[in-house]
């Protein structure tokens, strides 16, 4: 039986791979490196310049379809990462373990298998000591070649890898779509609230007000003991950066804009409805009868309240300072129309984000079942 037609089998990497150690000091191939999350990237993307220096002459000249294993530990890949080069060629650090797969196997599939999180179990056993001073794991080329792979026939490898490639392309498209929607929404918010939108500018006159004149409530939330906040509970607890947890009592009931008052993301805004608990690190904002709360969500975001935070060890917003800020607003009916228009973007974005979560979940499930 031809090896390409064999059913699933277990084989050491060294039996299907061979070392690549070619160098070419005269090569003009791009200088690249391995990123745990993105694969091969230009070295200048991370270091602002190519920092190979005198060691460049020792860099490995990798060709398209060959692989490199970066045995450097990172947060994303604790035991290093392995990727196939898809560019025609590249010069890469000589500390990488470089190799090529023989023609009886489908290289993209092998690359996926080697970069799968389940491979960490084997790599962990190979680490002979702690991380070296240069940040590299003590995994030699010979050690790496000893890891075992569970391989189907060549044709099945190709079918699987090609399907996952299409899925990755679909995920990348979804990410670009979400980025475009968010960018378009930001542009729409700026265009409308700066008074440049003829559709809404002509609809009513815009008048200047302070934030205090627009709101029936604009105050910090209430103090709550950390012992009362749990992973589960009846009501969400909002702090300066979003939901902190849940508790069994509420401080606010209704529709409010929550502004983060303290923390790294102070000035962030979100709309909440129903019963919630707002801690002292959040500001509860509710429009008065002449204005619309949903409109304030976009207005406060447009005003970038974070720029008014007091600088210090813990950035924070002073409510009395924010209440004096001035802004231009239309009448309530126009506010409602603007809020409805902008919320349609939020609905589209959240719908597409749910689709992205589903696609990523399906990918993880497939990889979990494929590689053992």
Question: Which residues make up each language-model segment?
Answer:
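Generic structural signal for buried aliphatic residues
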Residues: 62, 67-68, 342
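Short alpha-helix capping/helix-loop boundary micro-motifs
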Residues: 47-56
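Ligand-binding loop in jelly-roll beta-barrel domains
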Residues: 101-106, 288-291
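Short, ligand-facing micro-motifs at secondary-structure edges
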Residues: 26-48, 67-70, 74-93, 108-112, ...
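Amphipathic alpha-helical coiled-coil/heptad-repeat segments
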Residues: 4-11, 15, 151-207, 326-372
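A short glycine-rich beta-alpha junction/loop motif
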Residues: 90-95, 129-155, 277-281, 313-333
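Non-catalytic DNA-recognition/assembly elements of restriction-modification systems
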Residues: 4-24, 146, 200-222, 227-237
């Amino acid at each position: 039986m031809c090896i390409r037609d064999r059913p699933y089998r277990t084989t050491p990497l060294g039996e299907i791979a061979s070392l690549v150690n070619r160098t070419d000091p005269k090569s003009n191939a791009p200088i690249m490196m391995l990123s745990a999350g993105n694969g091969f990237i230009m070295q200048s993307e991370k270091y602002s310049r190519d920092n190979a220096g005198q060691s460049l002459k020792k860099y490995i000249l990798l060709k398209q379809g060959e692989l490199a294993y970066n045995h450097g530990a990172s947060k994303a890949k604790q035991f290093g990462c392995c990727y196939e080069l898809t560019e025609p060629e590249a010069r890469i650090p000589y500390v990488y373990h470089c190799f090529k797969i023989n023609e009886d196997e489908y290289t993209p599939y092998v690359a996926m298998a080697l970069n799968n999180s389940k491979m960490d179990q084997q790599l962990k056993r190979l680490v002979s000591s702690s991380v070296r001073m240069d940040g590299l794991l003590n995994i030699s080329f010979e050690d790496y070649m000893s890891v075992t792979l569970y391989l189907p026939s060549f044709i099945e490898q190709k079918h699987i890898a090609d399907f996952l490639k299409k899925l990755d392309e679909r995920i990348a498209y979804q990410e670009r779509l979400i980025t475009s929607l968010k960018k378009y929404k930001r542009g729409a918010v700026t265009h409308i609230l700066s008074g440049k939108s003829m559709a809404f500018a002509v609809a009513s006159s815009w008048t200047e007000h302070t934030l205090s004149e627009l709101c029936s409530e604009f105050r910090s939330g209430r103090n709550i003991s950390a012992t009362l906040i749990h992973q589960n509970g009846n009501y969400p607890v909002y702090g300066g950066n979003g939901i902190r947890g849940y508790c069994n009592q509420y401080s606010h009931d209704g529709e409010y804009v929550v502004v983060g008052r303290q923390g790294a993301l102070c000035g962030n805004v979100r709309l909440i409805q129903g019963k919630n608990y707002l801690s002292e690190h959040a500001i509860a904002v509710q429009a008065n009868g002449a204005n619309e709360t949903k409109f304030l969500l976009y207005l406060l975001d447009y005003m970038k309240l974070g720029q008014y935070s007091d600088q210090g060890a813990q950035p924070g917003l002073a409510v009395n300072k924010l209440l004096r800020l001035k802004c231009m607003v239309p009448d309530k009916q126009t506010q409602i129309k603007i809020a409805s228009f902008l919320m349609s973007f939020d609905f589209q974005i959240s719908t597409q984000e749910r689709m992205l979560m589903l696609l990523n979940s399906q990918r993880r499930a497939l990889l979990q079942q494929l590689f053992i």
